[in-house]
């Protein structure tokens, strides 16, 4: 279900399921699932991408005019580029981040996912975590499964669509720690903080810590609820027994191998098997990927269980019903808080300034009526009603 057409030019590149390439150009790219580029002026070169949307005129350079075109870069899953954006490789952009402007200072924001990278006067400004409240990010996560064009019941690419997973949440843990360390090192009253070659404004840093903490509360709370739901517990011992993971697989670092999210230990074991010759057929490799994909939630719980003590300061082996209630209350606050932020973000699309008429002329009232006929009014928008329903259910 990969579509390349309308004079799309690609060389030395690999495209996976549900990629779309039209009009533009690709050279030496690894295009994971849902890498989409539609514009004639867009060049993707020497990079790894997945769940990515390239704006018109987006391009990168893998050549610094010294030792030849030897550099490469990565836009992690869900990254987007705006029109006329530019990145000088080597660089790495964190998951679900937005790149706007020209970036030449080789930033690595992989541990600050859901961020905006904005260029002002040749300087990269980083706004960490802000896309967690973006209606665009939520819409993207909802649309990808719906746009899966594969018709065969036996799907060869194992794709995990989860926005919050051990892969992204482990980066939030690191990002939260990084931001706290920056604030400690430079002082709470600094206007600007320096991170690698990027700048972070004070207000953005403080909000970023809050965004990451909210998302971590949401993920860990959700994991605990899923683990305990549907069972009546009479004692704390029963709760502790149920919380114990079913396997040790899942602890430690997780990786996203272009769609499949899995523990790094399992990927390393597969690589060792290939190198030693014990895994010597493509069908065996695919069977391993399928096993990891099917056991995702089992492995995810092992990871989440390990994080309970680090984040909440609660030893899972001594956890009580009161502790669970505390975690669930924090989870509810996080879910409803994020929903309200997404709701407010969606509201901007329906502000008077954003309302455009669809004719050649017309008064302000006619423009508003035009907009309403085409887009509907705010409160009846399907996405908005879904968010409001979600808030109502959770409260």
What residue spans do the PLM features occupy?
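Glycine-rich hexapeptide-repeat left-handed beta-helix
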Residues: 3-184
């Amino acid at each position: 279900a990969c579509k390349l057409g309308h004079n799309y030019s690609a060389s030395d590149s690999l495209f996976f399921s549900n990629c779309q390439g039209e009009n533009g150009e690709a050279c030496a790219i690894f295009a994971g699932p849902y890498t989409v580029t539609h514009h004639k002026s867009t060049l993707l070169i020497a990079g790894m991408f997945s769940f990515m949307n390239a704006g018109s005129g987006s391009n990168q350079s893998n050549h610094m005019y010294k030792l030849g075109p030897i550099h490469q870069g990565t836009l992690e899953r869900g990254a987007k580029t705006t029109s006329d954006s530019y990145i000088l490789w080597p660089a790495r952009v964190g998951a679900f981040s937005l790149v706007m402007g020209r970036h030449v200072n080789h930033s690595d924001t992989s541990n600050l996912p859901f961020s905006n990278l904005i260029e002002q006067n040749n300087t990269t400004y980083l706004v960490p975590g802000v896309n967690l409240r973006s209606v665009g990010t939520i819409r993207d996560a909802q649309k990808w499964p719906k746009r899966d064009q594969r018709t065969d019941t036996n799907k060869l690419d194992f794709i995990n669509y989860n926005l919050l997973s051990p892969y992204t949440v482990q980066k939030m843990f690191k990002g939260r720690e990084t931001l706290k360390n920056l604030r400690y090192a430079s002082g709470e009253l600094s206007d600007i903080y320096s991170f690698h070659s990027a700048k972070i404004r004070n207000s953005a840093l403080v909000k970023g810590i809050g965004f990451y903490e909210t998302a971590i509360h949401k993920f860990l709370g959700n994991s605990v609820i899923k683990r305990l739901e549907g069972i009546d517990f009479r004692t704390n011992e029963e709760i502790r027994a149920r919380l114990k993971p079913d396997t040790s697989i899942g602890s430690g670092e997780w990786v996203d191998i272009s769609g499949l999210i899995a523990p790094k230990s399992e990927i390393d074991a597969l690589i060792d098997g290939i190198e030693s010759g014990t895994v010597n057929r493509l069908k065996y490799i695919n069977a391993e990927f399928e096993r990891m994909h099917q056991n995702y939630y089992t492995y995810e719980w092992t990871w989440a269980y390990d994080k309970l003590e680090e984040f909440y300061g609660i030893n899972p082996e001594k956890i009580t019903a009161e502790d669970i209630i505390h975690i669930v209350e924090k989870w509810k606050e996080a879910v409803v808080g994020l929903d309200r932020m997404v709701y407010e973000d969606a509201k901007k699309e329906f502000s008077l300034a954003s309302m455009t008429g669809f004719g050649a002329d017309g008064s302000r009232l006619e423009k508003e009526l035009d907009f309403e006929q085409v887009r509907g009014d705010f409160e009846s928008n399907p996405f908005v009603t879904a968010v409001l329903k979600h808030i109502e259910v959770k409260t």
